[in-house]
């Protein structure tokens, strides 16, 4: 195992703010095993994503901000993000530990300003997200599709601003067609982070899951009896009872909400701990730790 080469208390070294999934992918693809960055989640405002180069790919791990001001990744909880990073310095996510943060400026222009000046410039950038398609009416216009992110360069008129897109093209845009995005400070406190993100929402099912040391649940059995192995969905329906309430992020359309006592028909048991199931016609993913397998043929054994 390579030794970690970063200070987890230096937030500016590993926290990249509202970086999109695609930009994180670009920064980390082909980089050394264990290179990583932490960014704001564009799916659930207030949460974070740990993006890591591992096993010739880039993995993205969701970090949930809990109401008690703690942070959760997989089945592990931490008091703060530096503690989380310290843990994964010596524990594998999937095939790697965290070794070093990705460079904040992977491709600085040759002979241009230094990184400290770039940092100041980046902090002063103003971003907007496009609300509608705009084909452009004149040669000086900047066409865009709904959902793009643009950098504002100049505001020569009240209703028309000059902007640059991700490809570097510059042109005029109609102000009523966009909304401003307020950049959150990378040094701000957890409770004061801005809910906006510069990234386009990414599907929740695209997140990876770190290795877990939590044992898989087993079918409940009578005292003194042998514990039965986890049943297979190939042998017929498997049922579980929700033992913990689950209220998913409103933006996560793949997650299954649970109330304590709900009977879940388990349709698939993924090895990463995210199971698939159905409750009253609603289908989705849920953590196996939120349910307890039971045998509907022997209800007295399930108490």
UniProtKB/Swiss-Prot annotation:
Q: Which Pfam families match?
A: SH2, SH3_1, SH3_2
Sorted keywords for this record are:
Phosphoprotein, Repeat, SH2 domain, SH3 domain
Which SUPFAM superfamilies does the entry mention? SH2 domain (SSF55550), SH3-domain (SSF50044)
SH3 domain: residues covered: 123-183, 235-296
Instruction: Give the span(s) annotated as Disordered.
Output: 184-204
User: GO CC terms on record?
Assistant: cytoplasm; cytosol; extrinsic component of postsynaptic membrane; neuromuscular junction; nucleoplasm; protein-containing complex; synapse
One of the record's GO molecular function terms: RNA polymerase II-specific DNA-binding transcription factor binding
GO biological process terms held by the UniProt record: acetylcholine receptor signaling pathway; animal organ morphogenesis; anterior/posterior pattern specification; B cell apoptotic process; blood vessel development; cell chemotaxis; cell migration; cellular response to interleukin-7
Query: InterPro entries from the xrefs?
Result: CRK_SH3_C (IPR035458), CRK_SH3_N (IPR035457), SH2 (IPR000980), SH2_dom_sf (IPR036860), SH3-like_dom_sf (IPR036028), SH3_domain (IPR001452), Tyrosine-phos_adapter (IPR051184)
Phosphotyrosine: modified positions: 127, 207
Which residue numbers delimit the SH2 domain?
Answer: 14-102
Q: Indicate the segments annotated as coiled coil, or none if absent.
A: none
Q: Which SMART domains match?
A: SH2 (SM00252), SH3 (SM00326)
What domain of life is recorded for the organism?
Eukaryota
Q: Cytoplasm among the record's keywords? A: no
Biological function: May mediate the transduction of intracellular signals.
Question: What PANTHER family does the annotation carry?
Answer: CRK-LIKE PROTEIN, SH2-SH3 ADAPTOR PROTEIN-RELATED
How does the record describe its quaternary structure?
Interacts with INPP5D/SHIP1. Interacts with DOCK2 and EPOR. Interacts with phosphorylated CBLB and IRS4. Interacts with BCAR1/CAS and NEDD9/HEF1.
Q: Which family does it belong to?
A: Belongs to the CRK family.
Please give the name of this protein.
Crk-like protein
């Amino acid at each position: 195992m390579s030794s970690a080469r970063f200070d987890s208390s230096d937030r500016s070294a590993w926290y990249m703010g509202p970086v999109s999934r695609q930009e994180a992918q670009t920064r980390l693809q082909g980089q050394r095993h264990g290179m990583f960055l932490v960014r704001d989640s564009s799916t659930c405002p207030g949460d974070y994503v740990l993006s890591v180069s591992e096993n010739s790919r880039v993995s993205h791990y969701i970090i949930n901000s809990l109401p008690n001001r703690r942070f959760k990744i997989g089945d592990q909880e931490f008091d703060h993000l530096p503690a989380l990073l310290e843990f994964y310095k010596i524990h594998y996510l999937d095939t790697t530990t965290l070794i070093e943060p990705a460079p904040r400026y992977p491709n600085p222009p040759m002979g241009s300003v230094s990184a400290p000046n770039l940092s100041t410039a980046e902090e002063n950038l103003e971003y907007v997200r496009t609300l509608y398609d705009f084909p452009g009416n004149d040669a000086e216009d900047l066409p865009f599709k709904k959902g793009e992110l643009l950098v504002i360069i100049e505001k020569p008129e009240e209703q028309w601003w000059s902007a640059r897109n991700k490809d570097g093209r510059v042109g005029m845009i109609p102000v009523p067609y966009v909304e401003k995005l307020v950049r959150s400070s990378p040094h701000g406190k957890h409770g004061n982070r801005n809910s906006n993100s510069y990234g386009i929402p990414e599907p929740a099912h695209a997140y990876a899951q770190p290795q877990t040391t939590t044992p898989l649940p087993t079918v409940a059995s009578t005292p003194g009896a042998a514990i039965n192995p986890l049943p297979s969905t190939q042998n017929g329906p498997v049922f579980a009872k929700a033992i913990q309430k689950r209220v998913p992020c409103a933006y996560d359309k793949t997650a299954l909400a649970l109330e304590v006592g709900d009977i879940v028909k388990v349709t698939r048991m993924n090895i990463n701990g995210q199971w698939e199931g159905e409750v009253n016609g609603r289908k989705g993913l849920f953590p196996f730790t939120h349910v307890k397998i039971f045998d509907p043929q022997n209800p007295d054994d399930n108490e």
